[in-house]
A protein has these predicted regions:
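C-terminal structural segment of proteins
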Residues: 1-168
Length: 168
């Protein structure tokens, strides 16, 4: 809305939906609720344990006030190519769980982003969570450069290398 790309007739504040603010673990994945803030993601023990690249990369998100209020769902729906979350969920082969009044569906990350600032989410849907498949053994790197600390990224890059069992 700051860029005047969207001019909604109605604006809803969904921050009070507590069911969308969580991190949970299953045997094969981590699920992150769409209303989890960047700060809560940075501080999440589960995220630090399974995906330390997230905790590391999110320290680049804007300034503390934005990290305290901005959410994973808002960041990925905005689909800003200079944002950290779209890169992270792409690297981690995420599934985005969306819902409308009638049904829930899962979108693979490669099918979620159509272009810069454009996603494959319908007008009546909201992102409810992101599912990240666990990776047994891997190494990672993330770098971001901006004009000043907290500014939009000029360039960011990341890599995840999954290691075979016999690698060290």
């Amino acid at each position: 809305m700051n860029f005047r790309l969207g001019q909604p007739d109605i604006l809803l504040d969904i921050n009070d939906i507590k069911d969308l603010n969580f991190v949970s673990e299953s045997s094969s994945s981590l699920e992150i609720g769409s209303l989890l803030t960047h700060t809560n993601a940075i501080n999440s023990n589960l995220i630090k344990l399974f995906f330390p690249i997230i905790s590391y990369a999110l320290k680049y998100v804007a300034h503390q006030t934005i990290r305290n209020q901005g959410t994973i769902g808002g960041s990925i729906v905005n689909a800003d190519p200079s944002s950290e979350w779209p890169l992270l969920i792409s690297l981690l082969n995420a599934k985005i769980n969306v819902r409308n009044k009638f049904k829930e569906r899962e979108i693979l990350v490669n099918d979620f982003f159509d272009s810069h600032f454009v996603t494959n989410i319908e007008d009546d849907e909201i992102v409810i969570s992101v599912t990240l498949p666990k990776i047994n053994k891997y190494c990672w790197a993330f770098e971001e450069h901006s004009s000043r600390k907290g500014d939009f990224a000029i360039v960011e890059t990341g890599i995840i290398l999954e290691l075979e069992d016999n690698c060290e």
